[in-house]
């Protein structure tokens, strides 16, 4: 998988969280556990990001999935700009799948 061409700052993580909440959390859930609000409505449950087969993937894996779709997930290439897709991938790896997320991002309310 490709590596991000962007060097994101900690401030960028707030934007990544907002993008994730807008585009991803409805299916993947706030913590990436595959328990989003759409699941009780009949949307097939996605695999948890915390499954070792997913958790151990590089950032480029999540960018690739957001760009091209994955399984039943539709591609977002035409809906989310490239930098923002990378930012979502960075947020997933840094904040959902590691302990390296800044406290202000963890507790921030985003819209």
Model-found features: residue ranges?
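Periplasmic/extracellular electron-transfer cofactor-ligation site
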Residues: 21-44, 72-74, 94-103
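Gly/Gly-Pro-rich "capping" loops immediately C-terminal to redox-active cysteine motifs
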Residues: 13-17, 29, 33-63
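Sequence/structural segment immediately N-terminal to covalent heme-attachment motifs in c-type
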Residues: 10-33, 67-68, 88
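Electrostatic cytochrome c docking/interface patches
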Residues: 1-19, 108-111
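Conserved beta-strand positions that form and line the central face of beta-propeller blades
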Residues: 5, 48, 72-75
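Flexible coil segments in periplasmic/lumen-exposed cytochrome c-class electron-transfer proteins
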Residues: 53, 59, 74-111
């Amino acid at each position: 998988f490709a590596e991000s061409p962007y060097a994101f700052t900690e401030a960028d993580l707030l934007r990544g969280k907002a993008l994730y909440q807008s585009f991803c959390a409805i299916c993947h859930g706030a913590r990436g556990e595959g328990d989003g609000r759409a699941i009780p409505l009949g949307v097939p449950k996605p695999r948890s990001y915390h499954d070792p087969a997913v958790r151990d993937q590089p950032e480029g894996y999540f960018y690739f999935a957001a760009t091209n779709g994955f399984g039943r997930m539709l591609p977002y290439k035409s809906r989310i700009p490239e930098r923002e897709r990378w930012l979502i991938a960075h947020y997933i790896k840094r904040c959902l799948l590691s302990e390296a997320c800044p406290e202000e991002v963890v507790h921030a309310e985003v819209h």
